[in-house]
């Protein structure tokens, strides 16, 4: 009788092994679900980035406002008749003024 019980126990373990640790077992399914969640998070970030880039491209194709903004920000260009004003933080302004006054002398 013991032999039958032990053999049944061994067969039960042999049947359960693929379910838990095999190629398509629960552990693999759990790992895959985690990978899918990570990939979905990455995809949503990339979709937001793509939407922003698509808006930039559309604005560059259709309007001049984006081109003017890029020229101002990236290249420091200004329109004719405009004045460029740069406001420095309070701690930097006195130090830069002192440097400028010593350089001019």
Curated annotation (Swiss-Prot):
One protein family per Pfam: DivIC
Topology Periplasmic: residue spans: 22-105
GO cellular component: cell division site; cell septum; plasma membrane
Location of this chain's protein in the cell: Cell inner membrane
Coiled coil: 32-60
Keywords assigned by UniProt, alphabetized: Cell cycle, Cell division, Cell inner membrane, Cell membrane, Coiled coil, Membrane, Transmembrane, Transmembrane helix
Transmembrane segments: 4-21
Membrane topology listed for this record: Single-pass type II membrane protein
Domain of life per record: Bacteria
GO BP term, example: FtsZ-dependent cytokinesis
Side Cytoplasmic, residues: 1-3
Location, primary (coarse class): membrane
Family: Belongs to the FtsB family.
Subunit structure of this chain's protein: Part of a complex composed of FtsB, FtsL and FtsQ.
Function: Essential cell division protein. May link together the upstream cell division proteins, which are predominantly cytoplasmic, with the downstream cell division proteins, which are predominantly periplasmic.
The protein's name: Cell division protein FtsB
Organism: Polynucleobacter asymbioticus (strain DSM 18221 / CIP 109841 / QLW-P1DMWA-1) (Polynucleobacter necessarius subsp. asymbioticus)
Gene name as annotated: ftsB
């Amino acid at each position: 009788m013991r032999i039958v019980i032990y053999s049944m126990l061994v067969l039960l373990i042999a049947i359960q092994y693929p379910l838990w640790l095999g190629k398509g077992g629960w552990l693999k399914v759990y790992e895959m679900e985690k990978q899918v969640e990570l990939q979905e998070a990455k995809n949503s970030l990339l979709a937001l980035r793509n939407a922003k880039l698509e808006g930039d491209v559309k604005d560059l194709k259709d309007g001049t406002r984006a081109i003017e903004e890029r020229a101002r920000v990236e290249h420091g260009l200004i329109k004719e008749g405009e004045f460029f004003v740069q406001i420095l933080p309070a701690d930097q302004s006195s130090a830069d003024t002192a440097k400028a006054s010593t350089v001019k002398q």
